[in-house]
Amino acid sequence: DLRMSRGLGDVYKRQVIIGTPEEIEKYGKGYDISGATIVDPFNDPNKQKYIDKFVELRSKKGVTPEMAKEQMEKDYMYYACLMCKCGDADGAVSGACHSTGNTIRPALQLLKTKPGISSVSGFFLMEVPDCEFGENGLFVFADCAVSPDYDSEKLAEVAKLSSDSFKSFVGKDAKVAMLSFSSYGSAKHDRVTMVADAVKIAKEKYPDITVDGELQLDAALVPEVAALKAPESPVAGKANTLVFPNLEAGNIGYKLVQRLAKAGAYGPVLQGLSMPVNDLSRGCFADDIVGVVAMTAVQAQNA
């Protein structure tokens, strides 16, 4: 739509816009998108290749060539994912006119998750002004956008993916705090146990990351509190990557920091997929699209 045209006018190099000439002319009028490649899903010479790939990937689910063609013409996100799968694109951005589910579903069906990863999560890169914590105010917050239900195994995966994301985007080593309302067993509850178990799994399964918990937020960030609550922790008092115990906490947490601390909140950026696919809010502005496209490019470069 118009916002996408504006956004891509700013980051036009090597961009692909999927749409009919009529759609592009209608919404792109007045914006310089001359550097972008336009792919018409109804008249693309590569279309049969994508139909064949769709059927190859989904034939066990009963997808026929006719069904694949219809789905690709009806939902351009399927077309984008097939371009990625066939090596004709490095990543995809959607969501300005689609729900999160409609963005993620084609990616899960066609691109799948990374080897060893069972689910997709979403993080925000947070930039907090005048902040002494994290990496000079830079943090990764996860999961803030995707999965409402977690167990210890999946939470450990979020820790690994978030650690990798922090390294990719910030260029520094991540210190991952697994958050709870308890620090090192100070409270007893099934939810505390789930987080503590996730820490154990993450340490055993992903020895390359620095992760600890369970930690309360103040113990994760503030050195003086960390010295009291978790003095032996390699993360407490210096965390820069915060993994929340569930989606409610993550979504509320990033919005609190965004609104009350006037922080920049860049995302949600999806992690766990085999190729970069990212979601936009339907209330996004052109600048938001530029940011998410840029972050998708970073993910592709580090894939």
Tell me what each language-model feature is.
Residues 13-44:
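Terminal amphipathic helices with adjacent charged low-complexity linkers/tails
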Residues 55-78, 82-83, 144-145, 181-241:
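Active-site rim loops that border cofactor/substrate pockets in soluble metabolic enzymes
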Residues 46-117, 250-251:
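N-terminal glycine-rich phosphate/adenylate-binding segment common to multiple enzyme folds
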Residues 92-95, 103-130, 210-212, 263-279:
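Short, acidic/small-residue loops that bind anionic groups at enzyme active sites
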Residues 236, 240-242, 246-261, 265, ...:
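A C-terminal functional module that forms or caps the active site or interfaces directly
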